[in-house]
Amino acid sequence: MKNKTRFALFLAVLCTAAVLAADYFVPLQTDNPDTGQLPAVYDGRKNGRAPAVKNQGSLGTCWAFASLQALEARLLPEESLDFSEDHMSLNNGFCIPQEEGGEYTMSMAYLLSWQGPVLESEDPYGDGTSPKGLKAVKHVQEIQMIPGKDYEKIKRAVLRYGGVQSSLYTAMNGDRSKSDSYNESASAYCYIGSEPPNHDSVIIGWDDGFSKDNFNVPVNGDGAFICMNSWGDGFGDQGFFYVSYYDSNIGMNNIVYSKVEDPGRYDKIYQSDLRGWVGQLGYGNDTAWFSNVYKAEESQYLKAVGFYATAPGTSYEIYAVRQAGKESDITEGYEFDRKIFLADGAFENAGYYTVSFDKKTKKELKLKKGERFAVIVKITTPDTVHPAAIEYDAGDGRTFVDLSDGEGYISADGKVWERVEEKQNCNLCLKAYTAAQ
């Protein structure tokens, strides 16, 4: 093949031990969260959108607490659920003990593959064990990544989705810790420096007038995010604290759980990327074609496809091939000429998105039991050279990848294809969803 594919590593640990049916949205009484004027002060605690404060104890599980507390905030006030951090931190498929921390792409992989969330009552925190066979009580179908330091977008995401998971650096590791960056009397935190983030929390509000004099270090102006921590209610203001807008890391890495559904909209998820977005693959430009071939386990309708946009402004075209042939037919360029157009569009933010095909005719998308079918995506991501998200073993001992469960193909032009498991030692992050009707 003339066009040579290339990898880009994505996974990095950010958090250490220092550390459907309904689209839930609660509008404010005043402004539209997407376009209206932002208030100078917003506090999710006063709007019923802050979940209960929790305590990670001595384990490096802040990433799991922040992820699930942001997810809990997403559902409030209609639903008040307590999700299990133990289950997420013990069943995510990464070779990282609870003591050593984790980061948000691990949370994304766990939730998007329907491994969870499960309820805290089913898997209580801190015992080091996790029951087998627990089912996810919600299905996360979309996670958006808010651009770094875009405070307006972060604030609008807080208004719309309840909480934004974000990262910061701290030398503290619990509610009794001390730090030159933390003013305990004002529950005010600001770190200015070059240390990378090592702790995750949830932004649930802000105060543009929070005085710069509250911080132990000089800052250029007033203003702070109101953040929910995971060190119990003995830390800060009953578990919450104020992080300066001028902190070096807050607002750099941000995710929101933008679409959460009750189980039942889709009956089956087809996937080969349980570890999720570990790296990226491409041909040295911003466009690539990629496809996964699956075998229908039941006679059902193809209802949706899910994949990652690896940077803002990603556009896509989605196709399907019924009765897909054998590998040699695909790699020689014959089989995918029969593709059926399903959808196209674009995403403002990076993240994971599920695109449904409700407007397609049932005849086109009715799969027979045992039928091989292909889902195909043409993706264009501006200013990137590796637009396709992949799961692969980065060689750092943190990721175990099973290449036997996937049949994926990638192409530079949509005509000549190569098998990624054999040629690139990876799985493609491309899921398919089916339902009985």
Predicted regions and their residues:
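N-terminal secretory signal peptides that target proteins for export/translocation
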Residues: 1-2
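Short, flexible active-site-proximal loops enriched in glycine and acidic residues
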Residues: 77-87
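Short beta-strand-to-coil "C-cap" segments at the C-terminal boundary of structured domains/repeats
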Residues: 207, 258-261, 322-324, 430-437
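Alpha-helical support elements that line or immediately flank enzyme active sites
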Residues: 56-79
